[in-house]
Amino acid sequence: MDSPAFFFTIFLWCLLLSITGYSIYVGFGPPSQQLRDPFEEHED
């Protein structure tokens, strides 16, 4: 448990988990109302 690789792995796992959680929050949570949809803006 004193290995630096163990703590580095835990750090990377937490970083990846937090980035994923934030992306889901921005994509589907309350901030998603401010996102624009380029397909809706494009007129054929």
UniProtKB/Swiss-Prot annotation:
Transmembrane segments: 6-26
A GO CC annotation given for this chain: chloroplast thylakoid membrane
UniProt cross-references to Pfam families, sorted A to Z: PsbN
Gene Ontology terms describing biological process: photosynthesis
Compartments where located: Plastid, Chloroplast thylakoid membrane
Listed InterPro entries: PSII_PsbN (IPR003398)
The UniProt record lists the keyword Ribonucleoprotein: no
Family in the record: Belongs to the PsbN family.
Name this polypeptide is given: Protein PsbN
Source organism of the structure: Chlorella vulgaris
